[in-house]
């Protein structure tokens, strides 16, 4: 039986599920950009791409060389195809305007070009996270300047989301709103090949991911909940839990999509004005879309992530996502 490439899968989606052709082409362009980023990441010290730029992004984070390289790869790959009205990146202060010499399309692309970039220099997994939204009609005019408001749509408005993870294999994990598929990069073919047909997160789990070094800064519901996890069989949950932490959301969520688990990045007391560290538009929304499509759940401790109305491109949120039973439990603790 012939293998199903990403291109073939997308063509079949266009035929059977009426996936628009321009969305198909957009996903293929993003996938090609991810292959290029994968190649750059794999060079490491040989390609002179390790280390920092000595600059900070809008988040106040020091930019790694590969952050900037990955951002440029995605911009250059997607600006000319005629599928997009604009782009927004975690690495850029403002929305990216499609140059006037290129046609405008019907979609908006939002991305974190290299999630977990602190892992680059130690050769640990990193990835690219992306989300696709429809552009509001008032911004579709070729002459209409695009501003931040066009992007400020709740996660329920996403038409596609996914990530590429650059680890021992390069994988692209994708949802078009009809389940979650996983594609592995066959470097001999140069194509992403369908290897994970229907990714599903089990409802229960005995594994969680959180940065325990921040424990002293957590709110009481999180302290209580993690204490119960750590208490094991003798505690109120009556079972033992393992903890995992890769320090890259894309890697931790990939593990959860593969075998279940709970990912937590809660609000902490060090910066009370910021409701969390992770970005709603670039990280929380696309990952929440994927997790829900795989049968899991995702909240900020109080409400469903996908229902949050964004107020800014770089808005931050607390995140609890993964196996449904544990997400519901920790969310309930926040409401008591």
From Swiss-Prot:
Transmembrane segments: none annotated. It comes from Pseudomonas fluorescens (strain SBW25). Pathway: Carbohydrate biosynthesis; gluconeogenesis. It catalyses: beta-D-fructose 1,6-bisphosphate + H2O = beta-D-fructose 6-phosphate + phosphate. Its EC number is 3.1.3.11. It is an enzyme of class 3 (hydrolase). Its cofactor is Mg(2+). Keywords: Carbohydrate metabolism, Cytoplasm, Hydrolase, Magnesium, Metal-binding. Binds 2 magnesium ions per subunit. This is Fructose-1,6-bisphosphatase class 1. Mg(2+) 1 binds at residues 90, 112, 114. Belongs to the FBPase class 1 family. SUPFAM superfamilies: Carbohydrate phosphatase (SSF56655). Homotetramer. The gene is fbp. Mg(2+) 2 binds at residues 112, 115, 283. HAMAP family: FBPase_class1. Substrate binds at residues 115-118, 211, 277. PANTHER family: FRUCTOSE-1,6-BISPHOSPHATASE-RELATED (PTHR11556), SEDOHEPTULOSE-1,7-BISPHOSPHATASE, CHLOROPLASTIC (PTHR11556:SF35). GO terms for biological process: fructose 1,6-bisphosphate metabolic process; fructose 6-phosphate metabolic process; fructose metabolic process; gluconeogenesis; sucrose biosynthetic process. One of its GO terms (molecular function) is fructose 1,6-bisphosphate 1-phosphatase activity. It is found in: Cytoplasm. InterPro entries: FBPase_C_dom, FBPase_class-1, FBPase_N, FBPtase. Coiled coil: none annotated. One of its GO terms (cellular component) is cytosol.
């Amino acid at each position: 039986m012939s293998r199903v490439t990403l291109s073939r899968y997308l063509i079949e989606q266009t035929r059977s599920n009426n996936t628009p052709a321009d969305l198909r082409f957009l996903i293929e362009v993003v996938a090609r950009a991810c292959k290029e980023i994968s190649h750059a990441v794999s060079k490491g010290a040989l390609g002179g791409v390790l280390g920092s730029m000595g600059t900070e992004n809008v988040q106040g984070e020091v930019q790694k060389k590969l952050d900037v390289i990955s951002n440029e790869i995605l911009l250059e790959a997607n600006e000319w195809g005629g599928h997009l009205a604009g782009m927004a990146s975690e690495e850029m202060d403002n929305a990216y305007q499609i140059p006037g010499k290129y046609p405008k399309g019907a979609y908006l692309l939002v991305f974190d070009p290299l999630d977990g970039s602190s892992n680059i220099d130690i050769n640990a997994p990193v990835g690219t996270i992306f989300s696709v939204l429809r552009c509001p009609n008032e911004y579709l005019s070729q002459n209409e300047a695009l501003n931040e408001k066009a992007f400020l749509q709740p996660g329920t408005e996403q038409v596609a989301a996914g990530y590429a993870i650059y680890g021992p294999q390069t994988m692209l994990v994708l949802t078009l709103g009809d389940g979650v598929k996983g594609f592995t990069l066959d470097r001999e073919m140069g194509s992403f090949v369908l290897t994970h047909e229907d990714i599903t997160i089990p409802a229960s789990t005995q594994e969680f991911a959180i940065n325990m070094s921040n424990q002293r800064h957590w709110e009481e519901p999180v302290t209580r909940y993690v204490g119960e996890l750590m208490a094991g069989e003798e505690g109120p949950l009556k079972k033992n839990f393992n903890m995992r932490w890769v320090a890259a959301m894309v890697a931790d969520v990939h593990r959860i999509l593969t075998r279940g688990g709970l990912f937590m990045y809660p609000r902490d007391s060090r910066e009370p004005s910021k409701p969390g560290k992770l970005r709603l538009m670039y990280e929380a929304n696309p990952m929440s879309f994927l997790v829900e499509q795989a049968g899991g759940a995702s909240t900020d401790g109080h409400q469903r992530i996908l229902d949050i109305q964004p107020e800014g491109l770089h808005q931050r949120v607390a995140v609890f996502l993964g196996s449904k039973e544990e997400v519901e439990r920790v969310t309930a603790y926040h409401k008591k």
